[in-house]
Design a protein with these regions (language model features):
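Low-complexity, highly charged intrinsically disordered N-terminal segments
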Residues: 18-133, 184-189, 195-289, 293, ...
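Walker A/P-loop
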Residues: 136-154
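Walker A/P-loop NTP-binding motif
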Residues: 151-165
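Conserved C-terminal RecA-like helicase domain
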Residues: 196-232, 285-286, 290-300, 306-311, ...
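Conserved P-loop NTPase catalytic core
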Residues: 198-211, 290-296, 305-446, 457, ...
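C-terminal catalytic or substrate-handling cores of phosphate/nucleotide-
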Residues: 258, 270-274, 417-447, 463-466, ...
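Conserved RecA-like P-loop NTPase helicase motor core
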Residues: 332, 544-627
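C-terminal accessory/interaction regions of large nucleic acid-associated machines
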Residues: 591-612, 730, 739-966
Length: 966
């Protein structure tokens, strides 16, 4: 955002509020509002000028920003309470102070503030009302995006939780001191209102920060809260902190700690002593009446129990220390709520949902809720930076990348992929020298746009070795000092020509393109003359720092009111949570094959208001392609969250999956996904069926009515010689049917194969002429008669084997009769060649001769008799020889015979007279889709959770016929 004087702030605030009530948000409307607001501000702030054009651009951008409603997946174990209690909490000091702070100090507009309010409301309503008595233990997860404002979100959640009555808040803030201290500073600003290093002098004006500086007399006295940690680099909960005199029975307490064995153990010891003071003398007795809220920032890092293995006996050796200590702290409280925050939930979804231990309790799987918080439209995420290709099979459209990537291919000598700690980079590659020039240009251009007090950062991430980082810092600093000297004193130096060429041939062109793509009115067009005039001042503000465990350098942005401009050389400390404010140029060569680690290293994601066109990412083409793949996998996983929410499934019941990389990248570390398995998703030569149905009679009546209307729309039917009715249908007809069956409530959420992939698979075959024609068959049963398309047809009986109050389930998750799958093959003549082909495939599948299928004598005669008859008749004949298992045994091979242009849908009309909840429904329709085998379809590999595997039973055909009641 541009630097604003008091008159401009007042004018922008007035115009922004006025715009909320306007239906029209055209540029003309916005300009009129700003001009009127400028006149008003001139009377209240005499002597200060208002830049109307700048405010019009600022407000125009804000008006075009939108934020999606968060996607919430819940087990509904917690009764909604927050929206009923919220109006009764007066005056909500913590939240109202924090909202005002975001508005005045962080310059969030009303729309953004409302989004934070709505998101935090959704989350707080999923944890328990702290006034609820008795034992309760809530486990949830909030999924955001890298650098999208997760900290602001959970500070908002904490503020509302404190207003609601939570007594103890513990924030687990990463694994590094710097990140813990940075998080503590955010808590100081948003919750405490004073520098926690000076708690005893918190009322001194010079120690008050953030919300503590606000003047809000309507709230009365500031809310009271005691921090047991502070913002100094060593302000963690140490062994000495165990002796603190803060009483658990007093006001609320907050701690911000590293995810490290020592501070976590210190908390456990302190709680043991403090609970004894409250009268909980018995060892292990939970603390009651003091509800705990634990926020786990970067919950996929260090919190996961990486020693948990399937089929391994539970003992002290298969739980990691940090995971154990977190769970033990939660166990100390009779009432607790745990919320894990992460932008890369790839590891969290593979936590064993059934893990439970006597001392530590249940693992950290988010069994109660998952909230997927989508960032606002102005967020620059992986899809915008790297893009990805269209994938028809899963229904995801292509995302075009912004033109900010610059390829690096000259780094091998200076920064080889593999190197030792004594490696000497020597001279900087030309690509890094160019990146330094790009950063100086970006800093100067932001000054031209009025962002003179803005922070500016450049990331140099080329090695994880500390000793090499120190050398890199030195040569980067030498190069930057050379550039700065030239800017000041050598106007005819070639560097000036390089700067001018970089601006005119790169920045000017790409800025125009980005301005068009983003429709950002604040990305004003700049000339070389304007930018070059600011180069010297911009360069003077830049410093080079190394950020790692052995360096004393810090990124103390909050201590630089005039703005900090820094080139940060580092690795691990810059890869997790630590924010690089105003990051515009990144030079990144560090490789990792893990999705989550790679994505967290991408510090260039986030909000780049007013300077997105100045951003550059220098990296290799291979890394760009890796990021693109992970961006797609992330988008697909978040689509899964949306499907889960639509189906009203609980996190514990809905299996999740993540797309695997074809060339060896890992979803996450192997020890974090011990409970995951690889699976292929493809419908070629497969049977897909529905076997779980809602017991809601109204839903099933609507679906039955739809099916009747749908088959009637297909035109005239013909009666099938095998019994039942038959139609032909087009691809479009079939897609309409599937869309209806995917509607919430129609099909059990475990029927995940009826998701978008099924529809997209059918659509994708269009390019190859596949699945253009469909045979629709409604088989006749042996039960009561119902009218369908004005024809009396006997219904099919399938017993209910479920005790679930909501869903009717079929035995073996199977509705289809194997003999019915050949009903559309009666026009194909069985030849010796076809039969030999089928039997050969069967032999290969079974790993030996198909002895059970054909034996000498009577069975051989039966096979010979099949020649010249239709494939359908032949299968029935073979089935008669072997019993009803005949069709089932060879149906995989039979699908090889179906033309790729033709699919089969069997619609079973189920008699539910004896099914609880559905007794009076005339019938419940169930589908079975049989797909021809084709080599033209793409196979997708996923890493899947155990719950996903359980939920896919109905994807796999069983040899047995379905259970029937005659």
């Amino acid at each position: 955002m541009i630097d604003l004087n008091e008159a401009e702030k007042e004018a922008l605030d007035f115009a922004s509020r006025a715009l909320q009530s306007k239906n029209s948000r055209t540029p003309e409307t916005i300009r009129k509002l700003v001009e009127a607001a400028a006149i008003m501000a001139a009377t209240t702030q005499p002597g200060l000028q208002v830049d109307v054009d700048a405010l019009v651009a600022e407000l125009g951008h804000a008006a075009s920003v939108w934020t999606e409603t968060p996607v919430v997946l819940s087990n509904f174990r917690v009764k909604p309470w927050w929206f009923e209690k919220k109006p009764l909490i007066e005056p909500m000091r913590f939240w109202r102070r924090y909202r005002r702070y975001l508005e005045q100090e962080k310059n969030l507009r009303d729309r953004d503030l409302d989004a934070v309010d709505e998101q935090t409301d959704s989350i707080i309503d999923r944890i328990q009302d702290p006034a609820t008595t008795g034992p309760w233990d809530i486990r949830g997860m909030v999924v955001g995006s890298v650098q999208s404002g997760k900290t602001a979100n959970y500070v908002g959640v904490i503020s509302k939780a404190l207003d609601a009555g939570y007594k103890i808040v513990i924030v687990l803030a990463g694994i590094h001191k710097n990140l813990r201290a940075q998080t503590q500073e955010r808590i100081d600003e948003g919750i405490l209102g004073f520098d926690s290093q000076h708690r005893m002098d918190q009322n001194r004006e010079d120690y008050r920060i953030g919300v503590g500086k606000l003047v809000m007399p309507e709230l009365g006295l500031p809310p009271s809260i005691t921090p047991l940690t502070n913002s100094s680099i060593n302000g963690d909960f140490t062994a000495g902190a165990q002796t603190v005199t803060a009483s658990l029975s007093g006001g609320p307490i907050i701690l911000v700690v590293k995810k490290n064995k020592s501070p976590l153990k210190n908390i456990s010891k302190w709680l043991e002593v403090a609970s004894g003071q409250l009268g909980h003398q018995a060892s292990g007795t939970p603390i009651s009446g003091l509800p705990l809220l634990m926020i786990d920032d970067e919950a996929d890092n260090a919190s996961i129990n990486t020693k948990d293995r399937p089929n391994v006996e539970d003992d002290e050796t298969n739980i990691t220390t940090i995971n154990k200590e977190i769970r033990r702290i939660l166990q100390r409280f009779e009432q607790s709520a745990y919320i894990g925050y992460t932008a890369t939930p790839f590891a969290n979804i593979f936590i064993n949902p059934e893990a439970d231990r006597d001392e530590e309790g249940k693992d950290l799987f988010p069994r109660d809720f998952i909230v997927n918080v989508r960032p606002s439209s102005r967020y620059v995420g992986p899809a915008k930076v790297f893009g990805y290709s269209r994938d028809l099979l899963v229904g995801i459209e292509a995302a075009a990348p912004l033109p900010i990537f610059r390829p690096v291919n000259d780094h091998e000598l200076a920064f080889p992929l593999k190197h030792k700690g004594d490696h000497d980079p020597g001279e900087l590659p030309a690509s890094l020298k160019e990146a330094i020039l790009a950063f100086v240009l970006a800093c100067a251009a932001r000054r031209v746009r009025g962002q003179k007090k803005a922070h500016n950062s450049m990331l140099v991430h080329v090695t994880w070795r500390t000793a090499v980082q120190q050398k890199v810092r030195k040569i980067v600093e030498d190069e930057f000092h050379r550039v700065r000297r030239v800017i000041h004193y050598e106007k005819n130096h070639p560097v000036w020509e390089q700067l001018k060429a970089l601006w005119e041939e790169d920045y000017s062109r790409s800025s125009t393109k980005i301005r068009e793509l983003e429709n950002d009115t604040r990305l004003s067009e700049l000339t070389w003359e304007q930018v070059s005039a600011e180069l010297a001042v911009a360069a003077d503000k830049i410093s080079v720092r190394e950020i790692h465990s052995e360096s004393t350098d810090e990124l103390a942005y909050n201590r630089e009111p005039e703005g900090l401009s820094v080139i940060a050389v580092g690795a691990n400390k810059l890869s997790r949570g630590l924010t690089l404010e105003g990051l515009s140029v990144s030079y990144f060569l560090r490789t990792t094959r893990m999705y989550d680690t790679l994505m967290q290293m991408g510090r260039w994601f986030g909000y780049r208001d007013g300077y997105l066109d100045l951003c550059r990412l220098y990296t290799t083409e291979e890394l760009r392609d890796w990021f693109s793949h992970v961006a797609f996998a992330e988008e697909e996983l978040k689509r899964e969250f949306e499907l889960m929410a639509d189906s009203r499934m609980t996190p514990a019941d809905y299996g999740l999956r993540v797309r695997e990389h074809p060339d060896g990248m890992l979803v996450t570390a192997l020890n974090k996904m011990a409970h995951g398995e690889s699976r292929e998703v493809n419908f070629s030569g497969r049977l897909v069926q529905t076997a779980f149905f809602s017991r809601d009679a109204q839903v099933q009546t609507k679906r039955a009515d739809f099916v009747e209307r749908w088959v009637s729309s297909l035109g005239c039917f013909r009666t099938d010689k095998w019994g039942g009715l038959r139609w032909t249908a087009t691809r479009g007809d079939v897609l309409a049917l599937l869309d209806a069956f995917r509607a919430p409530g129609f099909t059990h959420p475990k029927c995940t194969h009826f998701g978008p992939e099924l529809r997209s698979f059918i659509e994708a075959q269009q390019e190859n002429g596949g699945l253009a024609e469909w045979t629709i068959v409604i088989p006749s049963g042996s039960r009561k008669v119902a009218q369908i398309a004005d024809y009396p047809l006997k219904l099919v009986k399938r017993p209910d084997v479920s005790a679930d109050q909501k869903y009717y389930s079929l035995s073996k998750a199977n509705v289809q009769d194997p003999a019915h799958e050949i009903l559309d093959l009666d026009e194909i003549e069985l030849t010796e060649e076809i039969l030999d082909d089928v039997l050969t495939k069967l032999e290969l599948r079974l790993g030996g001769p198909p002895v059970p299928l054909i034996r000498p004598g009577e069975q051989q005669d039966a096979v010979t008799a099949c020649i010249g008859r239709s494939v359908a008749e032949a299968v029935v004949a073979l089935g008669e020889v072997r019993g009803r298992r005949g069709a089932s045994a060879i149906r995989d091979e039979i699908r090889q015979l179906r033309p790729v242009s033709r699919g089969l849908i069997l619609i079973y009309l189920l008699d539910t007279t004896d099914v609880e909840g559905l007794n009076d429904v005339r019938f419940v329709p169930a589908l079975a889709l049989s797909f021809p085998a084709t080599n033209m379809s793409k196979r997708l590999k996923y890493k899947v959770t155990p719950t996903w595997i359980k939920g896919q039973l109905q994807n796999y055909e069983l040899e047995e016929s379905p259970d029937e009641e005659d």
